[in-house]
Amino acid sequence: MKILVVSENFYPDTFAINDIVRILGERGHEVTVLTGLPDYTTSYIPEEYKHGKNREQVYHGAKVYRVPTIARRHGPIWRSLNYLSFVFSGNRAAKKIDFGEFDIIYVWEVSPVTMALPAIALKKKYKKPLFLYCMDIWPECVKAMGFKEGTFFYSKIKNLSAHIYQQCDHIAVSSKPFFDYLEKVDGCSRKKMSYLPQFASSDMLEKNFEKKPNGHFDFLYIGNIGKVQDIPCLVAAMAKLKDRKDVTFHIVGGGSEYEHAMAMVKEAGAENIVKFYGPKPFKEAMTYYKIADACMLTLDGKNRIGDTLPGKLQTYMAAGEPVIGAINGAGNEVIKESRCGLSVRAGDSDGLANAFLEYIAHQEKYANCGEAARKYFRENFTQEKHFETLEARLKEMINQ
């Protein structure tokens, strides 16, 4: 197949879409990418991408077209300008760039959903089907930004979100609770939706990340550090163990709340047990699993975003790590169904702290959690299963 991918985020920023594009190419498909400028990791555009540089590149055989965008920087105003600039530049590119022959458009939709607007323009121009992979649900995500339901801004975003989703020929959701939300809130037909959970590299299944017991307990968090990850809950739980000499919490990753997270740890007086490492490339980040007894997972439960099945959960499971989380929805269900660890309700910092203590006190009780995690992963979240399902769906859409 010839696939045109539209994603505001792409390499050299670290996102799953990088792997998706690479793997599709390895599986024999011809891939073209329309994206913006890489600024997610640092919030600023790197020098090598300024002033019109590197607007056309090749990534693992895929032709990449980059459109100019305003840097994210910090704060909601700059972030909104960043989002809008991709829509404007992407729509302009849809009109002016000749993308050649392709069979289908694939949108990798994390926030904001507006990144799909250039894809809609391309759909209309080339008369090709539009497939959207939904990992964030809108307008629910704007609640996490502080906009309340019923306000003028929320109602406008709600109408725009519904319009975007309804323009898609098919929507694959990464979490099952998204079915009801998209149907009830955005007016999408259940018939044009399917379930496609995220995947993690199956290579991790063969690696031995097991840490030998040494009397010290190391808990690891790897991934994005943003508002929806409910970092205040995680920090509050970690701080409750600050007087212990046998515990260390390791935080690997970056994001909009990274600086705030470090400030909260300092304010809580927990700097002695919490270590921050910043964002790391995927391969380097994987090495941190070797120091971990268990991995940590939190997600904001104040709205439906908390129903998400976070991609980092699959990665934790592929690494064979026990998982200790404060999460609702699909994530909570998977942890309990797979028996890969301990889970309390989202936002329950006391419960999360007690879960850490429970694991420390009865580590032998959870000795099989890592293998249980990998077993569940093999049955549900492998790369091969993801791409077989994706390819079948795309071919079906092309042949309709």
Describe each model-derived feature in a short phrase.
Residues 169, 273, 289-306, 321:
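Acidic donor-binding loop of glycosyltransferase active sites
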Residues 212-229, 235-238, 250:
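Conserved donor-binding/catalytic core segment of Leloir-type glycosyltransferases
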Residues 1-60:
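N-terminal subdomain of nucleotide-sugar transferases
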Residues 183-187, 191-195, 199-215, 230:
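Acidic anion/phosphate-binding donor-loop and adjacent secondary structure
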Residues 114, 121-126, 152-171:
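Membrane-proximal helix-turn-helix segments that form the acceptor-binding/catalytic region
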